[in-house]
Design a protein with these regions (language model features):
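Interaction-interface detector
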Residues: 1-120
């Protein structure tokens, strides 16, 4: 099964649907994203981009609220905190300070731009 994300005029993902792989096959039996996008457009209208759970296309699996960046050809999740920066390699948001790698649990504190240990 193939997955397609509908993006609005602001390049925000507004829904993701599943499409049979048969809808993507050309006359030679090769999958073509454009055929799947046309199929989705015929059914629902709008603009559609293929997405993948394994991240082999467009960096991340699209979710509602994600943004499609045409320059990076990637789906980018919503920014969780103002201080976090986008990794160009993964198109995931990363904290300005890495989370400690020890046996404790942490939550991000945006006020101090640091990790706070959580007592469990």
């Amino acid at each position: 099964m193939a997955h397609f994300a509908e993006i609005n005029e602001n390049n925000e993902v507004i829904r993701v649907i599943v499409v049979s792989n048969d809808e993507l096959l050309d006359e030679n039996g090769d999958e073509q994203e454009s055929l799947g996008a046309t199929f989705c457009n015929t059914l629902f209208g709008g603009t559609w981009k293929q997405t993948s759970y394994n991240g082999n296309i467009r960096k991340n699996y699209a979710g509602i609220g994600f943004t499609y960046d045409s320059t990076r050809d990637a789906f980018i999740p919503p920014k969780p905190f103002a201080s976090w920066v986008l990794s160009e390699q993964t198109c995931q948001w990363e904290p300005p300070v890495p989370m400690p790698a020890d046996e404790y649990f942490y939550v991000w504190n945006e006020e101090t731009t640091s990790w706070d240990q959580v007592n469990v």
